[in-house]
């Protein structure tokens, strides 16, 4: 080496596992937690609130139907020495089944309301929604069976059946038939609301995937 000559020594920058010194260490996690979409969250909460309102409607319809049928009774103002002409819901097993079935449906709806509230608080919770969907389907089946059977008897009471010599009793027991008909209408209103409940539950579960 000659005098006056300078020697340059290149020193590579020290590195570590996170990169060169002086650079900020990355803090990005390997697996980032998914952030729920706000639009989906709002829609699910809206469906849950609508579910709660529909359940109140089903409860009112089922209770009204059971009460109307359970209190349907009429006694004609004339009678003989041995007979008194009276019509009551407990004279027909179909109407008895109707009252029991609608009372069971109303009781189920009362028990399902807390789960509906849970779905409002936690819109993305799929467990309560699946449970409600299954139990709503069972309640809908029972409701439809009771409503259909009672509707057939009410129709027969209004029109009769000439082939079997069954007379139309509504010509004499008009108030009884009117009250029973109102109960059947209320039960079919509950059926319609149950269908909406199941539809919105399925829609909410679909959007969770």
Curated annotation (Swiss-Prot):
Any one of the GO BP annotations: cell wall organization
Topological domain spans for side Extracellular: 68-96, 151-182
Predominant subcellular localization, coarse grouping: membrane
Places the protein is found: Cell membrane
Protein topology in the membrane: Multi-pass membrane protein
Membrane topology, Cytoplasmic segments: 1-46, 118-129, 204-209
Keyword Transcription (UniProt): no
Gene Ontology annotations for the cellular component aspect, listed alphabetically: plasma membrane
Domain of life of the native organism: Eukaryota
InterPro entries attached to this UniProt entry: CASP/CASPL, CASP_dom, CASPL
Region Disordered, annotated ranges: 1-35
Sites where a glycan is attached: 161
Protein keywords: Cell membrane, Cell wall biogenesis/degradation, Glycoprotein, Membrane, Transmembrane, Transmembrane helix
Membrane-spanning ranges: 47-67, 97-117, 130-150, 183-203
Residues making up the signal peptide according to the UniProt record: none
Pfam families reported in the protein's UniProt record: CASP_dom
Oligomeric and partner information: Homodimer and heterodimers.
Function: Regulates membrane-cell wall junctions and localized cell wall deposition. Required for establishment of the Casparian strip membrane domain (CSD) and the subsequent formation of Casparian strips, a cell wall modification of the root endodermis that determines an apoplastic barrier between the intraorganismal apoplasm and the extraorganismal apoplasm and prevents lateral diffusion.
UniProt similarity note: Belongs to the Casparian strip membrane proteins (CASP) family.
Protein name as annotated: Casparian strip membrane protein 1
Annotated organism of origin: Cucumis melo (Muskmelon)
């Amino acid at each position: 080496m000659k005098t006056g000559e300078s020697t340059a020594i290149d020193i590579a920058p020290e590195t570590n596992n996170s990169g060169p010194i002086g650079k900020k260490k990355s803090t990005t996690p390997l697996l980032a937690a998914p952030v729920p979409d706000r639009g989906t969250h709002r829609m699910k909460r809206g469906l849950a609130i609508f579910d709660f309102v529909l359940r109140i409607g089903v409860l009112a319809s089922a209770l009204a139907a059971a009460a109307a049928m359970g209190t349907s009774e009429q006694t004609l103002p004339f009678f003989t020495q041995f007979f008194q002409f009276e019509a009551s819901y407990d004279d027909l097993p179909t109407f008895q089944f109707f009252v029991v079935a609608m009372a069971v449906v109303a009781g189920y709806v009362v028990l399902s309301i807390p789960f509906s509230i849970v779905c409002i608080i936690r819109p993305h919770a799929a467990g309560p929604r699946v449970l409600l969907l299954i139990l709503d389907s069972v309640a809908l089946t029972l409701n439809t069976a009771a409503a259909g059977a009672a509707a057939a008897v009410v129709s027969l009471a209004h029109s009769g059946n000439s082939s079997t010599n069954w007379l139309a009793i509504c010509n004499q027991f008009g108030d009884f038939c009117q009250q029973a008909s109102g109960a059947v209408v209320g039960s079919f209103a509950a059926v319609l609301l149950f269908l909406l409940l199941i539809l919105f539950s399925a829609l909410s579960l679909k959007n969770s995937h």
